A protein has these predicted regions:
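N-terminal Rossmann-like dinucleotide-binding module
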Residues: 1-41
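Beta-loop-alpha module in the N-terminal Rossmann-like domain of NAD(P)-dependent dehydrogenases
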Residues: 16, 43-102
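Acidic-histidine catalytic/liganding microenvironments
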Residues: 23, 54-55, 119
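Conserved acidic residues
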Residues: 29, 42, 58, 135
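A contiguous active-site-proximal alpha/beta segment in oxidoreductase catalytic domains
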Residues: 90-149
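Rossmann-like dinucleotide-binding domain that binds NAD(P)(H)
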Residues: 146-175
Length: 175
């Protein structure tokens, strides 16, 4: 049984909380959010360092505001935890590079929450495009500005989905 911690209990953190409860072989061992006012069925820590010292964990989901991802991830890596980090992975490329190097150095698995790849409509489109040559891609987003992304802005928060989908559907890297 993998013991998971969930760090950040905002909109995305609550989504991960619900999802993790239904994953076989996963046990939610602890939650961490200094501003959480809600009741959960699991222990909630207000301090990440205290949680990491007190709990015997295997992995963590980081669903804090993006500006806090790097610090939380580095602390978790020091404890040897594998990570799922909500996107965008960091506020800038330099911080993401630091996390990548630390994960490699410690042999830690890190995944970024690119969930759109698993959308049934995207899976159907990927299958449809399987033997086709893609010449041009145009993506349009029609949705209101979500308040939860004010720390990094709409391009950094939502465009990462679009860029990931272009890579996924085309099977090519963007240079």
């Amino acid at each position: 049984m993998l013991k998971f911690a969930l760090i950040g209990l905002g909109v995305m953190g609550k989504n991960h909380y619900r999802a993790l409860q239904n994953v076989a072989g996963v046990q939610i061992a602890a939650l961490c959010d200094p501003f959480c006012k809600e009741n959960f069925a699991h222990k909630i820590y207000a301090n990440l360092d205290e949680m990491l010292e007190s709990e015997n964990l295997d992995a963590a989901v980081i669903a804090t505001p993006t500006s806090l991802h790097k610090e939380a991830a580095l602390k978790c890596m020091q404890k040897g935890l594998n990570l799922l980090i909500e996107k965008p992975v960091c506020a800038n490329a330099a911080d993401a590079q630091i996390l990548l190097e630390e994960a490699k150095r410690r042999d830690i698995k890190v995944a970024v929450g690119h969930v759109e790849r698993f959308n049934p409509a995207i899976a159907a489109l990927k299958k449809e495009l399987e033997n086709e040559e893609i010449y041009s891609v145009q993506i349009t987003r029609n949705a209101p500005f979500p308040q939860r992304i004010t720390d990094v802005g709409i391009l950094a928060d939502l465009a990462v989905h679009d860029i990931d989908l272009i890579r996924f559907l085309s099977g090519k890297e963007i240079k």
